[in-house]
Amino acid sequence: MRYGEKEIKEFDVENMEIWPNDAKNDYIIKITLPEFMCCCPRSGYPDFATIYLEYMPDKFVIELKAIKLYINTFMYRNVSHEASINEIYNTLKDKLKPKWIKVVGDFNPRGNVHTVIECRSDMVVP
């Protein structure tokens, strides 16, 4: 097993590395993860997406290698577009407890269908 595969396989979301946020100002962190992959729970075919994460930290920020490894744990999981983005959103919201957070999954078209899933803490239903 290669070292990257080992790191992904052994990654434990419960022990995801987060750091204290020592900044006195409010600010937004924007992270783009252009190589997201999961497997369709129906067909098993791979689905690819770019994940856009934006959040206003309170007491914690995510360590960048930790978010990379966490995102890569979805690579061989059978999970829908909706479930994957909701899981990422809920995990980061629970771990970081940010003042505000938004997670967007912009999935590559498959079968002539393009899907964008968005979860955000300030969601207002029209």
Curated annotation (Swiss-Prot):
Keywords: Cytoplasm, NADP, Oxidoreductase, Queuosine biosynthesis. The keyword Cytoplasm applies. The active site is at C40, D47. GO terms for molecular function: preQ1 synthase activity. It is an enzyme of class 1 (oxidoreductase). Pathway: tRNA modification; tRNA-queuosine biosynthesis. It catalyses: 7-aminomethyl-7-carbaguanine + 2 NADP(+) = 7-cyano-7-deazaguanine + 2 NADPH + 3 H(+). Its EC number is 1.7.1.13. InterPro entries: GTP-CH-I_C/QueF, NADPH_dep_7-cyano-7-deazaG_red, QueF, QueF_type1. One of its GO terms (cellular component) is cytoplasm. Substrate binds at I62, E63, L64, H81, E82. It is found in: Cytoplasm. GO terms for biological process: queuosine biosynthetic process; tRNA modification. Catalyzes the NADPH-dependent reduction of 7-cyano-7-deazaguanine (preQ0) to 7-aminomethyl-7-deazaguanine (preQ1). Belongs to the GTP cyclohydrolase I family. QueF type 1 subfamily. This is NADPH-dependent 7-cyano-7-deazaguanine reductase. The gene is queF.
